[in-house]
Amino acid sequence: YLSHAERVIRVLMEHVKDVPHVIGYQLDNETKSYGTAGPRVQAMFVDYLKENFPDINDFNHEFGLDYWSNRVNDWDDFPDVRGTINQSLAAEFCKFQRSLVTKFLSWQADIVREYKRDDQFITQNFDFDWTTHSIGYQSQVDQYDASRCMTVAGADIYHPSNEELTGAEITVCGNISRSLKKDNYLILETEAQGLTPWLPYPGQLRLQAYSHIANGSNSVMYWHWHSIHNAIESYWKGVLSHDFSENETYREAVVIGNEWKKIGSHLKNLKKENKIAIMLDNASLTGFTQFPLENAGANGYNTVMRWFSDALYRLNIEYDMISSKERDFSSYECLIVPALYSAPESLLLALDSYVRNGGHLITTFRSGFSDEYLKIYPDMQPHILHECLGLHYDQFTHPHHVDIVPVQSDVMAAAQKHFSHPDDSAFSLTSSACEWMELITCDTAVPVLKYSHPAYERYAAAAKNQYGNGSTLYFGTMFENDELLESVLLSFLHETGFSGGDLSSDAPHYPLIIKRGINDSGKELCYYLNYSKDPVSVTHHGKNGVELISETAIVCGNKIDLGGWGVAVVEM
């Protein structure tokens, strides 16, 4: 296969390498492992294990294969890994499959580099885990490793539209993309008309396009130009419909293009300096697939991650993503580590050190539970982190008819300040626990939330702790009330003195989204994005500037009126 592929790549590169308007090269298309597990792949996996475990006894011990007579006494007797009942082995095979993607893309990039000019880039359209649309971190690729061979990261982001449009997927998947090279990225595919339920309302295509750029993308490219007439993507509609005629989507794309001809030089290469980050980990994602939550299935890891990322998004707190392979988190005031199910001790010690030296850590149930091979740590949970978190647990279950209530008055105060309820009698921060619950005993930690249930009322559902020069917030469960989660986060961030967002009681909240950054001219841009059909008026807080689209002067304190699905961009 590689031999034939190389012939094709070289012929193509010879054909286009001198064409002046070829600006870069996309290596492949949404390349993933796709469950590859043929005889050759399995033989390569055994070679990979031999390299990592020269002594087969060490391999058997690390993966617990003596249990249930799974022991492998000779590498030549290694069984078909598909269908194994040993989740550690299954997870290691997933890791190996991801490494094949990294090697394959790097192999292609090496060939392309023999031909490309210095002014041309190499990219790849990474996609994301999927339900009916892009939802979060990709399980079949280690995108941080795979992107090393590229000069710019690329992404395909698809999301709900019309009544279901929130912009959250544009942000979370865009933030993953921006984090891969710690730089701007390219949207190589996103929806025009898209799937039948996605047909955008007037104004939404433009709002989506500006949202991508506000997040740090340097492009918006649509899949695809015209709708196709046969086969599986016949109803994945492009800019043009099947009749090739102008339509509402096409005309709105023309508006976007004409605006960017005028102001694009002000928008490109937007840089951000966020003060909070969310950690991503492929091994934990796999772990949550092998040992799932109650209802989320294979999407459990991204469900927990999105619980936090979407809360930050609604609160207009911009955030970065970082890889779990990093060990220096000192550039961030606060670090969110969701569902770190699989973690080497080096990472847990780095998190402990981060807090001890003044960082503020937010983490969740099942973090620090198992090592890098999904072997459960045999001591107090959470392993290593129990001291910095100031708590421990030894039992957990799926919550049924278990309510969550605040313990601390500052959580209720944060909710009352930030969320307007015309009928105060209906205002409640009670919520239902879901997916997983740990029975937390606080040692030095202080309960923030508790379980309202006669069997569990003595246990904390969430707790905070002071440790060294920093602090921690731990969630032992999930719950369904967004306002409760946002209130807990706001209260904690207030206490830490967080400077990376507006935490005031009158701070704008979703559906009004605000994004900021520094452009190529060193000027600050402030994007106002209205994710609602209803018009809204927002007060501009910041230096005096110019609204770029309308060329209107803006003074601090001015009201900016946005129509339904409207956009404004102020340069200061």
Residue spans for each PLM region:
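Polysaccharide-binding and catalytic clefts of secreted carbohydrate-active enzymes
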Residues: 1-163, 167-170
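Carbohydrate-binding surfaces of carbohydrate-active enzymes
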Residues: 75-78, 106, 118, 147, ...
